[in-house]
Amino acid sequence: MVKNSIIPVISQEKKEKNPGSVEFQIFKFTDRIRRLTSHFELHRKDYLSQRGLRKILGKRQRLLSYLSKKDRIRYKKLINQFDIRESQIR
């Protein structure tokens, strides 16, 4: 996933790039999560990075739950766009 390719998709409705938006923050966390998981294929015992990954996953989950409460349509669109599994715990 390339940063430049996704920014226009996120800011398409607002006609401006807003790095503080919930969608952009979720994109950044998702990008970091995917990079870290590919890192773990080579470095299985990198426990410090695994802890960082768990922290990032928690932050992304909190943002996703916030977005699902505020705007369910944007939440569903974002989940489908980034191929994120929907949380079962509410």
From Swiss-Prot:
GO terms for cellular component: chloroplast; ribonucleoprotein complex; ribosome. It is found in: Plastid, Chloroplast. Keywords: Chloroplast, Plastid, Ribonucleoprotein, Ribosomal protein. It comes from the Eukaryota. One of its GO terms (molecular function) is structural constituent of ribosome. GO terms for biological process: translation. Its main location: plastid. Belongs to the universal ribosomal protein uS15 family. Part of the 30S ribosomal subunit. HAMAP family: Ribosomal_uS15_B (MF_01343_B). This is Small ribosomal subunit protein uS15c. The lineage of its organism: Eukaryota, Viridiplantae, Streptophyta, Embryophyta, Tracheophyta.
